[in-house]
Amino acid sequence: MLKQTLLYTGKAKSVYETDNADHLILVFRDDASAFNGEKIEQLDRKGKVNNRFNAFIMEKLAEAGIETHFEKLLSPTEVLVKKLQMIPVECVIRNYAAGSLCRRLGVEEGKELTPPTFELFYKDDGLGDPMVNESQAIALGWATAEQLEQMKVLTYKVNDVLKALFAEGNMILVDFKLEFGVFHDRIVLGDEFSPDGCRLWDKDTKKKLDKDRFRQGLGGVVEAYEEVAARLGVDLSDI
C-alpha cells in the first residue's frame, strides 16, 4: 500500500491517501495538545506508543464483534485503516465524574455514575467541540437517527469490553470518547483509542495514567502511557 497525498493534519495524527480508494494511512506523531491547541508540546515516543496501544485495543474490540477501521500496523508510527465517511459527532461515555462534567454540573471528581452517562459533542475546534443533543445532530444533517442509535449502542458495548479489560490491569476506565464513520453503509469505529482520548486511574491510588498528566502539568505523560500498556500486556519492546 503506497502512501500518497497528505489529506489532513490533526492534533496528533496525519492522514494520507493511498493507492487504494478504500484505505488511508494514519501517522501517529509525538505532538501533545490540550485546551483546543493552546498548549502544545512534543513528547518523545508518544506517537509510537499510541500507535501500538491503539492497535491492541482495536484488535480486542474486533474480537468482541465491534467493527473498526483498523487494518494493520505498517511501521512503528503508521497504521493502515479503512477510509470512512466520518460523522462529525463524538460519543462520550462517563463511568465516573471528571473533567468538563465536574465543571458543568458541580459534581465532585471521582463520583461513580450509575448508569454511565452518554453525551454527544460536535467536532469543531473553532467552536470548542460543543455539547449537542440528538435532535440537533439530526436537524443539522450530521447523522441520522438510526446512525446515532447504532453509535450509542456500540459505544456502550465498547465500554463493557474495555472496563473489563482495564480492570484486569487494576485500572478504572473513567471516561472516553469515540468517533464513528460510514464504510459501505455500515457504522464503523474510527479514529483511535489511546490514553489521549480517555481517562484511566489506578484502582487503588487513583493515580492518573492518561492525558490529564499533560493537561494538568503532572509530568511523566509517556511513562504513564507505557505503564498502561505494560499492565495490559502490550508489547512495546521493539519500538
Swiss-Prot record:
Enzymatic class: ligase
Q: Show the GO MF annotations.
A: ATP binding; phosphoribosylaminoimidazolesuccinocarboxamide synthase activity
Species of the source: Acinetobacter baumannii (strain ATCC 17978 / DSM 105126 / CIP 53.77 / LMG 1025 / NCDC KC755 / 5377)
Record bears the keyword ATP-binding:
yes
Q: Name one GO cellular component term.
A: cytosol
- What UniProt keywords apply to this chain's record, in alphabetical order? ATP-binding, Ligase, Nucleotide-binding, Purine biosynthesis
Q: Which Gene3D superfamilies match?
A: ATP-grasp fold, B domain, Phosphorylase Kinase, domain 1
Indicate the transmembrane segments per the record: none
UniProt-listed Enzyme Commission number(s): 6.3.2.6
Q: Which family does it belong to?
A: Belongs to the SAICAR synthetase family.
Q: Which residues form a coiled coil?
A: none
Pathway of action: Purine metabolism; IMP biosynthesis via de novo pathway; 5-amino-1-(5-phospho-D-ribosyl)imidazole-4-carboxamide from 5-amino-1-(5-phospho-D-ribosyl)imidazole-4-carboxylate: step 1/2
Q: Which SUPFAM superfamilies match?
A: SAICAR synthase-like
| Reaction equations catalysed | 5-amino-1-(5-phospho-D-ribosyl)imidazole-4-carboxylate + L-aspartate + ATP = (2S)-2-[5-amino-1-(5-phospho-beta-D-ribosyl)imidazole-4-carboxamido]succinate + ADP + phosphate + 2 H(+)
Q: Could you provide one GO biological process annotation from this protein's UniProt record?
A: 'de novo' IMP biosynthetic process
Q: What is this protein called?
A: Phosphoribosylaminoimidazole-succinocarboxamide synthase
